[in-house]
Amino acid sequence: MSRATPIQNYRNIGISAHIDAGKTTTTERILFYTGVNHKIGEVHDGAATMDWMEQEQERGITITSAATTCFWKGMDTSLPEHRINIIDTPGHVDFTIEVERSMRVLDGACMVYCAVGGVQPQSETVWRQANKYKVPRLAFVNKMDRTGANFFKVVEQMKLRLKASPVPMVIPIGAEENFTGVVDLLKMKAIIWDEASQGMKFTYSEIPAELVELAKEWREKMVEAAAESSEELMNKYLEEGDLTEAEIKLGIRTRTIASEIQPMYCGSAFKNKGVQRMLDAVIEFMPSPIDIPPVKGMDEDEAPVTRKADDEEKFSALAFKLMTDPFVGQLTFVRVYSGVLKKGDSVYNPIKGKKERIGRIVQMHANNREEVSEIRAGDIAACVGLKDVTTGETLCDPDAIVMLERMVFPEPVITQAVEPKTKADQEKMGIALQRLAQEDPSFRVKTDEESGQTLIAGMGELHLEIIVDRMKREFGVEANVGKPQVAYRETIRKTVEDAEGKFVRQSGGKGQYGHVVLKIEPNEAGKGIEFVDAIKGGVVPREYIPAVEKGINEAVTSGVLAGYPVVDVKVTLHFGSYHDVDSNELAFKMAAIFGFKEGCRKASPVILEPMMAVEVETPEDYAGNVMGDLSSRRGMVQGMEDMVGGGKAIKAEVPLSEMFGYSTTLRSMSQGRATYSMEFKHYSEAPRNVSEAIMASRAK
C-alpha cells in the first residue's frame, strides 16, 4: 500500500496554552473547519471532542493529550491537501508531564494566549519545555472579542517574559465587541469572516482607512524578519525595499523551523474568527517530519545512530502515552520516526529486552477510532495488544535495534496514603493503581513496609485528586485518602573515607561473614546514587560485588535521620575481607547496608525539602499582604511585575510543606480575586528547626 499523503504534507503539531486561554475551543474549531466535526463542541457545555475523559468535561480543563488527525487544503482551498496530526496538551501545572511527553514527539507547536490575560506563568513553563525539545512554534492570540483584549500587549509580553521573537503576520481589526476580522500583512488585505456560516466563508476587502498606516508599519517588520533568513533575500530587500509574497513565506518558514522567530496570529475561536488563517500558517510555516533533523538514538552496542523520516528505513517509534480504553483495553500511542509498521508485525522493546506483537492499529479522532492496516514514518497512532510497554520507551524492528533518547520524568513531590472504602476492593484498587502508574510515569505507587498502607505519589494535590477520581470512574473503586505528605529526601554534606560494615555470625556450623570498607561522599545535585567498585587484589571476591551494590541500593531507600530516601551520594567500595567458607551474598549485602548507614551518620546527614516556584497574580491592593504571607511561609520573594490588565505578578520560591491549603488563604486574603500557580523547582536543605520537627514526627 502506498502512502496516502506525501510525508512533506504531514504536520505533527501540539496545541498548548495556559488554562482558560481557550485552547480546547481552538482545537474544536480546527476539527470543525477541517470537516471532521459537524457540530461544534463547546467547552462551556462540557461537550468538547478533545476533552474525552469525564473529569475533563466536568472540570472544563484538559488533562490528557488526545491525538487527532485531520486534513486541510487552506482557507481558500488553494493548497495541496495536508494531513495535520494534533496533540492537545493540558495547561494545568500538575500535568506538566503530559506537556513534556507530547513536546517530545511533536514537530511544531501552536501556543495559544488569551488576549486579555496575556502570557501567564504556565505559558512560561510550556515555552521552556518547547525550548528543551527545540520545537518550532507559532502563536495564536485568542479571545480578541473579550473586554480588555489587546493583541499588541501580548506581543510585548512574549518578548519580555518568554524572551521570544514574535512576528505578527496579521493585525486585528477592532477589539472587544468591535473585533470583526484581521488584516493579512502578506496580502495587505482585510479578511472578514462570515458569521452565518460559522466562519466557513470569508471575504477579502480593502484595509480600513484608520489601519492602513499601522498595517504598513507591521508589514515592514514582517518583511525585515523574512529578509534576515538569507543574504540573498537581505540584499534584495535592501535594493528594492520589499519582497514578493513567496519570498516572505520562504524567509519566515526558514527562520520559524530554525526556532529563530514565531509567526503570530489572532482571532476569537469562540466567534469563529482567525483560526482558519492560523491553520494555513501551520501548513505554510510549521515543519514536516522531513524538515527536522533525523532522530538520535543508540544501537545495541551503545554506538550513536540516527533514523531518518523515511519509509525505506528500518522501523522505529516512541511510545509516548498509554491509555486504558473500556472497549479494547490498553492503547499505546506511538510516534513513528522511520519505516513502516503493519498490523500483526512484531516489535522489539530494547529497554525491557522483549519482543511483542501488534494486534491492531487505530488512529484517533479525539475519542472516535478508525482501524488502519499500517502506519508509516511521521504517523501518530495507537497500537492495541502491547502488554509490557511503559511511557517513553522505544519500539523498533527486531532486526535493527535502536534505543531512542528516553524522556526524563520528574520525581513526585507529594505523597498520600490511600485505602479502599470496602476491604473487598483492596485487590481491585491495586490493579487500578498499577494501571494508572503505567500510564503516567510521574505518578508512583508503593506500600509502606511498616504500616502496610498503600501510598500514592504525584506532582501536586490536583494530580492525586484526579487519580483517585479516575479509580472511582474507570475501575469502580472508591477510596479514602489521607492527608498529603511531602516527599522529603536525605543526603550528606561531608566525605567519610572509611565507613566499615561487618556482618559476622559464627557459632558452630556454617556461619555468615561479610566485611566491606566504603568511601561515602556527596554527589552533584541530581546525580542520584553512584556506586564505584575500586577493589584491588580480590580482597572482596568478584562474585560478591553485585551483592554489595544491592545492599547499597536497599540502604538508600531509608535514610538515617528520618527514614526518607537518600539521594546524590557517591559510594566507593575500596576494601574489605572474606571467609572461604562462611562468606556469601547475603552476608556482603548486609555488611554493605551496615557500612552505608554507619558512614551516613558520620557524613553530616541533612534533610532536603522540595521547593516550589510559586507565582501569584493579584490586584495591587492585596500585593503587600500576599508578599507578607509568602514570607511567613518561609518563602523567598524573587520579584514583582506589572500585569497586562493591571495588578501584580509576584514570583517566589516556597517550601511545598508550607503551601498546603494555600488556595483557601489566598482566596480570603484577596476576596477571591487573586490566583496562583506553582510547580516543583528543586530540592534544598531544610533549616534545622524544620528538620528537627520532621524527625520528631517520624519518631512517633
Curated annotation (Swiss-Prot):
One of its GO terms (biological process) is ribosome disassembly. Residues 8-290 form the tr-type G domain. One of its GO terms (cellular component) is cytoplasm. Its main location: cytoplasm. CDD domains: EF-G (cd01886), EFG_III (cd16262), EFG_mtEFG1_IV (cd01434), EFG_mtEFG_C (cd03713), EFG_mtEFG_II (cd04088). Keywords: Cytoplasm, Elongation factor, GTP-binding, Nucleotide-binding, Protein biosynthesis. GO terms for molecular function: GTP binding; GTPase activity; guanosine tetraphosphate binding; translation elongation factor activity. GTP binds at residues 17-24, 88-92, 142-145. This is Elongation factor G 1. Catalyzes the GTP-dependent ribosomal translocation step during translation elongation. During this step, the ribosome changes from the pre-translocational (PRE) to the post-translocational (POST) state as the newly formed A-site-bound peptidyl-tRNA and P-site-bound deacylated tRNA move to the P and E sites, respectively. Catalyzes the coordinated movement of the two tRNA molecules, the mRNA and conformational changes in the ribosome. Belongs to the TRAFAC class translation factor GTPase superfamily. Classic translation factor GTPase family. EF-G/EF-2 subfamily. The lineage of its organism: Bacteria, Pseudomonadati, Pseudomonadota, Betaproteobacteria, Burkholderiales. It is found in: Cytoplasm. Gene3D superfamilies: 3.30.230.10, 3.30.70.240, Elongation Factor G (Translational Gtpase), domain 3, P-loop containing nucleotide triphosphate hydrolases, Translation factors. InterPro entries: EFG_II, EFG_III, EFG_III/V, EFG_IV, EFG_V, EFG_V-like, EFTu-like_2, G_TR_CS.
